UniProtKB/Swiss-Prot annotation:
Protein encoded by which gene: APOBEC2
Subunit structure comment from the entry: Homotetramer.
UniProt source species: Pongo pygmaeus
Broad class of enzyme this protein falls into: hydrolase
Taxonomic lineage from the root: Eukaryota, Metazoa, Chordata, Craniata, Vertebrata
The name this protein goes by in its record: Probable C->U-editing enzyme APOBEC-2
Keyword Mitochondrion part of the UniProt annotation: no
Length: 224
């Protein structure tokens, strides 16, 4: 009975995550799906320190980093000059939809035409082609939105589809930058929940500057 319930739960999880339902007779595949939680978008004000240290690290080969972490700052300014500011982070879990799309669905689902929006994202990796397309469409119909995206790594930058998507982002008015060591420190101070007894000072990893320069050069070559 328990196995049937687990199989039913796995079927539902597979459906939500876009898995092939024909493979559920495979015991190993079934075990994998049972262990896979349903898709969800996690939101909050501060992310755990161990998540930041692993997911945001600007390594050249991002093996195992199959989530997107997006920290955001939203500043909405009215005609009188008053600024309403908010910040937080999103994390996608086993998702077909990504954190970039979730931002526009949950954090800023609508834009007040009387306000000017300045939005800054600090993202663990650059957008995929589908997310870039969503961003471009949002920018094209929202003239009072300015978006700056700072990324720790470039996602699959060798692929022509990704390169074209990044170029189109620039053409749409989106500012795209690689995170400098100072940007990682800013995220650490403002978006990370430091562990008890841990130093609140940001401790840069050994190759942080070298990897920043590596990705900065790649992005410049793509966008030139």
């Amino acid at each position: 009975m328990a196995q049937k319930e687990e199989a039913a739960a796995a079927t539902e999880a597979a459906s939500q995550n876009g898995e092939d339902l024909e493979n559920l007779d495979d015991p190993e595949k079934l075990k994998e799906l049972i262990e896979l939680p349903p898709f969800e978008i996690v939101t909050g004000e501060r992310l755990p320190a161990n998540f930041f240290k692993f997911q945001f690290r600007n390594v050249e080969y991002s093996s195992g980093r199959n989530k997107t972490f997006l920290c955001y700052v939203v500043e909405a300014q009215g005609k009188g000059g008053q600024v309403q500011a908010s910040r937080g982070y999103l994390e996608d879990e086993h998702a077909a939809a990504h954190a970039e799309e979730a931002f526009f669905n949950t954090i800023l689902p609508a834009f007040d035409p009387a306000l000017r929006y300045n939005v800054t994202w600090y993202v663990s990796s650059s957008p995929c082609a589908a997310c870039a397309d969503r961003i471009i469409k949002t920018l094209s119909k929202t003239k009072n939105l300015r978006l700056l995206i700072l990324v720790g790594r470039l996602f699959m930058w060798e692929e022509l589809e990704i390169q074209d998507a990044l170029k189109k982002l620039k053409e749409a008015g989106c500012k795209l930058r690689i995170m400098k060591p100072q940007d990682f420190e800013y995220v650490w101070q403002n978006f990370v929940e430091q562990e008890e007894g841990e130093s609140k000072a940001f401790q840069p990893w050994e190759d942080i500057q070298e990897n920043f320069l590596y990705y900065e050069e790649k992005l410049a070559d793509i966008l030139k």
